[in-house]
Amino acid sequence: MHSCWKMKLQNEKTLGHSVSRSSNISKAGSPTSVSAPSSFPRTSVTPSSQDICRICHCEGDDESPLITPCHCTGSLHFVHQACLQQWIKSSDTRCCELCKFEFIMETKLKPLRKWEKLQMTASERRKIMCSVTFHVIAITCVVWSLYVLIDRTAEEIKMGQNNGILEWPFWTKLVVVAIGFTGGLLFMYVQCKVYVQLWKRLKAYNRVIYVQNCPETCKKKIFEKSVIIEPNLESKEALGIHHSDTNSSYYTEPEDCGAAILQV
């Protein structure tokens, strides 16, 4: 009896071990969700089909939509109007730096009440203020000198008409004043060119540039080329099918002849 009980206990132990091993194996083999280690970074993947600006890498919206100003494709196809305007002002170029397509632009000036000041350094501002002050003083002196000269000349002409002779000091003063006046005019012309350049800079700074989309004709041409290529491929496939059909018919004819001969 004791030996029977010992045999039963040993069998139960072996069965328990095998059951536990099978359960462990099933646990190990079952597909469970494995938690990723915390050291792996979690990145949000955005779909590649989203259109973004090639300058600021942001998407377009209702306030600032994306435009297609040139022939660039892929991720360089779209750009914001404001980003492109700022780039054109800073680079002073009118064409794409990649495909060399000249932008179709429409420029408009802002209203005078919305004009902004030029961004100049302190030294440039001091130079402009000094030159303006000097020119105002110079113009005042020239106008006063002309007035005095004309007044004295009129008196000397009256005296010369009475005497019939104009003295040399009159002609000397006239020549000196004419030379000085001519030099002043040349100097004013050079300085006025500087003022004109400043005025052009101010106008360019306060203009609004609207860049239009690339014309659809170019896109149509590209589309037409692809359409022309596709029918050629289809025609080649049709010709291949036709040749295969003719070959099959060619090989079936001898079979018909053989069948006819057998009947005879």
From Swiss-Prot:
Chain positions covered by the region annotation Disordered: 15-47
Keyword annotations: Cytoplasmic vesicle, Endosome, Immunity, Lysosome, Membrane, Metal-binding, Transferase, Transmembrane, Transmembrane helix, Ubl conjugation pathway, Zinc, Zinc-finger
PROSITE patterns registered for this protein in UniProt: ZF_RING_CH (PS51292)
Pfam families: RINGv (PF12906)
EC annotation from Swiss-Prot or TrEMBL: 2.3.2.27
Gene Ontology cellular component list: early endosome membrane; endosome; lysosomal membrane; lysosome
A single MF term (Gene Ontology): zinc ion binding
Binding-site positions, Zn(2+) 2: C70, C72, C96, C99
Biased composition (Polar residues): 17-47
Principal place of residence: membrane
Record localization: Cytoplasmic vesicle membrane; Lysosome membrane; Early endosome membrane
Broad enzyme group: transferase
Topological category with respect to the lipid bilayer: Multi-pass membrane protein
SMART domains: RINGv
List of residues binding Zn(2+) 1: C53, C56, H80, C83
CDD domains linked to this entry: RING_CH-C4HC3_MARCH8
Chain ranges of zinc fingers (RING-CH-type): 45-106
Substrates-to-products reaction catalysed: S-ubiquitinyl-[E2 ubiquitin-conjugating enzyme]-L-cysteine + [acceptor protein]-L-lysine = [E2 ubiquitin-conjugating enzyme]-L-cysteine + N(6)-ubiquitinyl-[acceptor protein]-L-lysine
Pathway stated in the Swiss-Prot or TrEMBL entry: Protein modification; protein ubiquitination
TM annotation in the entry: 130-150, 170-190
GO terms of biological process kind: immune system process; protein ubiquitination
Domain notes: The RING-CH-type zinc finger domain is required for E3 ligase activity.
Main function: E3 ubiquitin-protein ligase that mediates ubiquitination of cd86 and MHC class II proteins, such as hla-dr alpha and beta, and promotes their subsequent endocytosis and sorting to lysosomes via multivesicular bodies.
Protein name, UniProt field: E3 ubiquitin-protein ligase MARCHF8
UniProt source species: Xenopus tropicalis (Western clawed frog)
Taxon lineage: Eukaryota, Metazoa, Chordata, Craniata, Vertebrata
